[in-house]
Amino acid sequence: MGLKGEKYTSDAALMGAVAVGRQDALSVVLDRYMPMVSRVSYRILCDRCDSEDVTQEVFIKIWRNSSGFDGRYSLSTWIYRITCNLCYDRLRRRKVLSIFSIAPPVYETSCPVALSPEEDFITKETWEIFCRASRNLSPKQRAVFTLRDLEGLDTEEVAAVTGLTADQIKSNLHIARKNIRQELERYGKVR
């Protein structure tokens, strides 16, 4: 018996099956991309509840818009783009709500648990500092930093996801790295 999803030989075939309501195809998409969507949304939002909400919204959007997948980009790029756009929306909504709130915004600062084996080295304190620093970044800077430095996408892939040019990516990445480094230095986490 083959691996789950083995019969879908391309992203287009997989999304075509999702578009016609194939439950097994949707399960393949969920299995393949749920960890990535959860990880990226959590890294951008620094809030577990918001991340869980965005993750659900991403897969609802994939299901509803599956017939709109045209294959110009890889499925992972399309899903990264949906994830980032929903994160931008959430960050904008968070900013608007904070304007009308008397209390300061509350952000979860707990260290990500079991997001990936590579992240085991992140301590709770370092994660708190990272989240604090990332709040000072624009949504685009957060996304570029997350996609490029934390997810390991190359500049061309980041451009496909964000719609930014290579120069804009470099500029946003430089600003994000500088701000995060300054915050880490302030707390003695980087020399």
Language-model features and meaning:
Residues 2-5, 19-28, 38-57, 166, ...:
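Short, charged helix-capping/linker segments at alpha-helix termini
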Residues 7-11, 97-122:
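Internal acidic/polar
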Residues 13-17, 129-137:
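Short amphipathic alpha-helical boundary/capping segments
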Residues 19-20, 46-47, 59-74, 94:
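Sigma70-family region 2
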Residues 39, 53-60, 73-85:
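Structural recognition of an alpha-helix C-terminal capping motif at a helix-to-coil junction
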Residues 68-71, 81-101:
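Arg/Lys-rich amphipathic alpha helix in sigma70-family domain 2
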Residues 130, 141, 156, 160-186:
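DNA-recognition helix of helix-turn-helix
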Residues 144-148:
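A short pre-motif secondary-structure segment
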